[in-house]
Amino acid sequence: MLRWFEEGGNNSDVVISSRVRLARNINGYNFSYKMSDTDAKKLVKNVTDQLKTISPISGYNSYNFDYLDAYQKMGMRERHVISPYLEKQDYAAGFVAPDEDVSIMINEEDHIRIQAFAAGMNMQKAYTLADKMDDVIGDVLDYSYDQKFGYLTTLPSNAGTGMRASYMLHLPALAGNDKISGLIPEVGRFGLVLKAMEGDNNKALGDIYQLTNLVTLGKSEKDIIDNLDNIAEQIIAQERNYRKQYITKRKMTALDMVYRSYGVLKYARKVTLNDGELLLSQIRFGLASGLIKADGFDESNIYQLMIGIHPANLLMISNKDMNEEELEVSRADFIREHLPTIH
């Protein structure tokens, strides 16, 4: 079965994924940050026991932090199956769909976080997946809900719908033209946040950024998605425009950049994470812009590589501890093994 990020999607030249995350708490428990270890264990066990027998969750893969090592947790976080916050929790559990498009986290910043992904720009699909799962879970758990304030959440900014919607965007042209710092305050005027998925906002790792809503209280799910879509479409148009300008004015330079990136990755024997992500970003740009072609391989496959070269994945493949140099050698081997032939 293909995982969600192995599929193509709308506007996939710029939009890697659509994600909806719902924050929910359960009556009878303190918020997660106030819970004792005893109560945290009780929450994890009780919720897990209640959810594991119901459809469709009974067909999901389950996990419990009692039985995972640090590398396994890190690998799940690298694939966005769990959040950085959950990774640091001592007591946590959850369920993941076989294709990893739906994930249920227990004892995150809120008692339950439901997240759903769709490839490319398809927020409605992600929302439908999350909403259906929310209904299933809400049938067996007593959510904390107030008629005036909506779903009660640990952070007041999440109250109301409890929904955060976000797009993961590949923005090499905007980043390369130093336009990200100007976009951040602009999207902020519309209640949105634009930030690097990893690294510095001015130069994100792999040129990958997240656009997400900041305000949920007083907004319907449709309001949130419509506002996000409107701004995302403007950013997509700007990114495409800068790509077109670059290729029109400096096509040989663009081709040279893409082929150099390919050549380095094809023959390098050591690759750092930063270099690997940068060079793969440039190849993704080349594929998405039509500068190069690879049979049976497109920009979505490049994103698989961008996930695959993170440390935990390499450590799990090797099944042994590695120092930094050994990781760089393993990363170069992994890239050479999966890099397609281009023309």
Residue ranges with predicted function:
Residues 150-168:
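Conserved phosphate/anionic-ligand binding catalytic regions in large, soluble enzymes, centered on
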Residues 1-148, 163, 175-177, 182-184, ...:
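Long, Pro/Ser/Thr-rich low-complexity/intrinsically disordered regulatory tracts in eukaryotic proteins
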